[in-house]
């Protein structure tokens, strides 16, 4: 599995930044300890946003009753929905693009635990040249029947169509740390970094030998990730996030034609996200109210 220079560089940045960020939060390196910490302990927050994604090349293994073969160094891309206010801002269509949502809780003023979904879309590029190893029996395909060993072959739609377009669903929990960069009146700019671990529940759209696949949701594997970004509080309660996430996905149980026919792959990913969120000091207000009314 080859990893592009772009993905290698950004993953290295996220890895280093994530280790340094807790130190930044205390102000040791950026000397921001003189700034008063925002009272975020017990604060609840939620956000919704959209993403673009890039993927490393991957080897994809297909197994079934009459075939067992691997395609090597498959290139893939995301499938971004062209911007339209009607699609991106209408409640019944906001689920069509590549989206993200998370809900979190501040354990203290600088540490947040959250859970959420990254809905990416993964499309193996058609008509690319690849290599194949393994076997395909004539019961599966007369056209492609044979034994292969690193044999060049074209990745055409009548051979294999391989997509996670509804989608590449990464459900994860993340632990993030925050550090102050700037504050004026009610506005504030923070940076954050974190670690995530979760599972993949794709709805894979796969056709083999010109036969339509099952196209069902299925728990296919696991993933892990690092995230870093900026949070800008515009007014109390309302904020925007800009962030980059990089990670590794391993799916060893992808349903293709039916639950007896499977695929497996592993790859690195990068994701750029923009989101709008709302935070609520519900527990703090409740605690203060109980103190004022003993």
Where are these regions (language model features)?
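Residues that define the transmembrane beta-barrel architecture of outer-membrane proteins
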Residues: 42-44, 95-99, 165-171, 189, ...
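Outer-membrane beta-barrel translocator domains and adjoining extracellular loop/strand segments
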Residues: 58-64, 126-132, 203-212, 253-259, ...
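Bacterial Sec-dependent N-terminal signal peptides
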Residues: 1-33, 294
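Flexible, solvent-exposed coil segments and beta strand-coil junctions
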Residues: 76-84, 148-157, 204-210, 252-257
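Gram-negative (and chloroplast) outer-membrane scaffold detector with strong preference
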Residues: 40-42, 102-207, 275-280
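Short glycine/proline- and aromatic-enriched beta-strand/turn motifs that initiate or cap beta-hairpins
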Residues: 25-105, 271-287, 294
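Predominantly the C-terminal beta-signal and adjacent terminal strand-loop region
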Residues: 59-61, 67-68, 229, 233-294
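Extracellular loop and loop/strand-boundary signature of outer-membrane beta-barrel proteins
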Residues: 33-34, 86-89, 157-163, 209-217, ...
